[in-house]
Amino acid sequence: TRRIYHRIMEEDGVDRKPGAEELLKYAKEHGYRLALATSSRELHAQLLLKKYGLFDYFDGAVYGNMVSAGKPDPEIYLKACASIQVLPEFAIALEDAPSGIRSAAAAGMRPVMIPDLVEPDEAVLELVWRRFDTLYDVIDLLESDFQNS
């Protein structure tokens, strides 16, 4: 089953979010340290990141198989921040799912939501620092020097 899954992922994959590469490139060019905090298993995530040419943008990564508790537990975000030596209160987390927003907020980060399949409810929206429609909007946030907001 796993072999079939990996073959399908290699052939069809998943859609890359519009603006992903542009955002990662902008952040790297402007000195941001980037960590990946994904619930996906390491092999699967690396396969997709390499396929889309995004893997090398990240300075650190924590995968679902590296934590004992999944999102909304803050463990994955705390480890991701530690992997790039950034305190959570000085980090933003980009999320498309309510459980990820809860995880980032519990870790003490600034959660930024770009909704995908699941629209956030009121309880999740209270945890969100910023909400955007696309990853391109996050570039605008970085350009505006969000540290002063």
Residue ranges, per PLM feature:
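Short, basic/glycine-rich phosphate-binding loops at helix/coil junctions
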Residues: 1-6
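Short, acidic loop-to-helix structural element flanking the phosphoryl-transfer center
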Residues: 7-36, 42-46
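Asp-based, Mg2+/Mn2+-dependent phosphohydrolase catalytic module
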Residues: 25, 41-149
